[in-house]
Amino acid sequence: MRVKGSGRNYQHLWRWGTMLLGILMICSAAEQLWVTVYYGVPVWKEATTTLFCASDAKAYDTEVHNIWATHACVPTDPNPQEVVLGNVTENFNMWKNNMVEQMHEDIISLWDQSLKPCVKLTPLCVTLNCTNLRNDTSTNATNTTSSNRGKMEGGEMTNCSFNITTSIRSKVQKEYALFYKLDVVPIDNTSYTLINCNTSVITQACPKVSFEPIPIHYCARWFAILNCNNKKFNGTGPCTNVSTVQCTHGIRPVVSTHLLLNGSLAEEEVVLRSENFTDNAKTIIVQLKEAVEINCTRPNNNTTRSIHIGPGRAFYATGDIIGDIRQAHCNISRAKWNNTLKQIVIKLRDQFENKTIIFNRSSGGDPEIVMHSFNCGGEFFYCNSTQLFSSTWNGTEGSNNTGGNDTITLPCRIKEIINMWQEVGKAMYAPPIKGQVKCSSNITGLLLTRDGGNSKNGSKNENTEIFRPGGGDMRDNWRSELYKYKVVKIEPLGVAPTKAKRRVVQREKRAVGTIGAMFLGFLGAAGSTMGATSMTLTVQARLLLSGIVQQQNNLLRAIEAQQHLLQLTVWGIKQLQARVLAVERYLRDQQLLGIWGCSGKLICTTTVPWNTSWSNKSLDKIWGNMTWMEWEREIDNYTSLIYTLIEESQNQQEKNEQELLELDKWASLWNWFNITNWLWYIKIFIMIVGGLVGLRIVFTVLSIVNRVRQGYSPLSFQTRLPSQRGPDRPEGIEEEGGERDRDRSGRLVDGFLAIIWVDXRSLCLFSYHRLRDLLLIVTRIVELLGRRGWEALKYWWNLLQYWSQELRNSAVSFVNATAIAVAEGTDRVIELLQRAFRAILHIPTRIRQGLERALQ
């Protein structure tokens, strides 16, 4: 009995422990998180896109056509919006900025496009008979008392004569023109030819074409341009003060070398920027804090003449010079320039360990590299910048080797045949400008190169650094203005875990081969069934949009190839590309939202459970401590997988809804008696009965064949066979003589319909008996389960009452014990306090008693 009781107690404890463990598991189970889609989140990624221009072209001279074609740009925004991005740190790299490459290609394309309709000077590639033009040959001198200072050196200009074929091919006409010495190449003592005739096709700039740099704002649609506002930003690395703009500031496309003109200034101090300061092959871009004014002039009062070189073609040349032939020059304030060099030297010494800084002239090369080249009023100046870069700085004070007065005068030469962008095969002839030419510009930056070499071999002093003016790569000019910008693409779609789940039609998910269908082409599912194709609608929609995009790209390429026929400028192509790309990106996002069942929603819940392998951070940490950019970087590797799961979930949901709608036709009881449904019932019934009869015939034939093989012959169909008794009525034994006569025998029926009737009756009886037995079994099981369940519930209720009573008794006992312990402790404390108090009160008595004993 004791053992049995122990077993029962153990069984009760086991049940109770199992129940408690289940309760603990339910209570401690982690709450399920679900993927939620957000549209419009502030997330971006680095991108390269087509930029277009904005400009105030109408604010400039409308009589001329500027070579930058800014008339095709959109107007600038009178109230540009700039949004400061708080708590954002973004990495910039001015040396890996696609905006620079794009601007460089745009400027080259603009120059090429502006020269396409202009006159080719191929007829001038003939032998020229030239003589040096001297000052004493000038006519109508207006200032005969002027000093020789500033006069052009002898041989700087030449008077050349040449033969030109007239409109009548058999006749040759002799013409003359004045050329600068830099534009002709001597063949012998008196014979010359134009400098680029042997290597390039020279194109004359069209009349009324202006080279004046007009500010161009680069803009992006459906993209964002990030702007770094750090005042000392060196062009690379993280930037903590970031804002977003729709367009850049106005950038003047000034084509110059050595000096950067009319650009932006540094806000606090001079800033040096280089991809690698230790690599002497890398250009150093200097951004000044204060601009230095440079005033340039061509004092010659030139006249121009037109020479016809063919039908509808004219060559514009310098006809004569009124007054003295004076040299072009530029003036710069010596004090301002020295102060600028002083600020640059301070930064260079900080960068190169307080070494002695030496500025020297260019080391040689093409005229564009050796001299400071730029455009002034339509004339291309080539100025000797040796006086600007000829000083040594041992500290904050420098020694200038040139000395002189308060103004630095740079002698300049003029070229009319320009080797465009230092590219082989392209040259331009800039027609001369009438009258005098003057221009004023601001020097806002420098382009420097550092001498290399090994100091141990004596190539240079190890305590000095030599810097020379550089340039030639116009990318550095654009980079000096675009250093603080970068283009990013906006990714408005974001996914994050939440506790919310989409309420959907619950149905078991079918294993349909959608993965294989993902790799089918747009028309690859044409031969599949409609049911299989319905699961690939997502793929088809995506491929359809891709086809539209591809067609648009093909259209753009065709337009770009035929822009000379359509008369589209480079900016027109850029705007078309930018607008189409913006529409494409918007359609792509809307397409994804539609595929996910989130059209028109900013917050869209899904039925995709969140996988902790994507990110195991808690909701509080995600939504309370992380930005969308940080979160996007956290799950960037799983974004495509999450998108795929959302698509599959939505496909299953749509399939479930379709099947639910198909079940709606059974919602009304009257639909059950529809004639169409009854025909369907009859068809199914006939198929079942026919199948059963066929099986009966097959088995009968097989039985006959089997008996024949065993040596029996088939019985007559008129023979009566004894019917089988039930299991509760066994056949009689031999002693029960007359019992067997009572066995009933069934006669084999005649005819096919009779056989069908007997088989159908037997089938119905068999089905009835089996269903009745199954119903009885189910009833017994339900009854048993109900009784056992009721007993279990009563047991759990009694167990709950028992343990609640035990807990109540334990709590009462604990409170009583605590109260008793507190009471006893309180009594002891009070007793101790009383003893201490009495001891203090008896101190005088004890003192008096002690004194009395001492005195006795």
UniProtKB/Swiss-Prot annotation:
Chain ranges for the short sequence motif YXXL motif as given in the UniProt record: 712-715
UniProt protein name: Envelope glycoprotein gp160
TM annotation in the entry: 685-705
Location of region: V2: 160-197
Keyword Signal: yes
InterPro entries given in the database record: Gp120_core_sf (IPR036377), Gp160 (IPR037527), GP41-like (IPR000328), HIV1_Gp120 (IPR000777)
Residues modified by glycosylation: 87, 129, 135, 140, 143, 159, 163, 189, 198, 234, 241, 262, 276, 295, 301-302, 331, 338, 354, 360, 384, 394, 400, 405, 442, 457, 611, 616, 625, 637, 674
Lipid anchor positions (S-palmitoyl cysteine): C764
Extracellular side: 32-684
Chain intervals for the UniProt region annotation (V5): 455-470, 457-470
Annotated region (CD4-binding loop), positions in chain: 362-372
Listed Pfam families: GP120 (PF00516), GP41 (PF00517)
Span list, region Immunosuppression: 574-592
Cystine pairs: C53-C73, C118-C206, C125-C197, C130-C160, C219-C247, C228-C239, C296-C330, C376-C439, C383-C412, C598-C604
Taxonomic lineage: Viruses, Riboviria, Pararnavirae, Artverviricota, Revtraviricetes
Organism: Human immunodeficiency virus type 1 group M subtype B (isolate SC)
Chain residue ranges for the region called Disordered: 450-472, 718-743
Family label: Belongs to the HIV-1 env protein family.
Coiled-coil spans in chain: 633-667
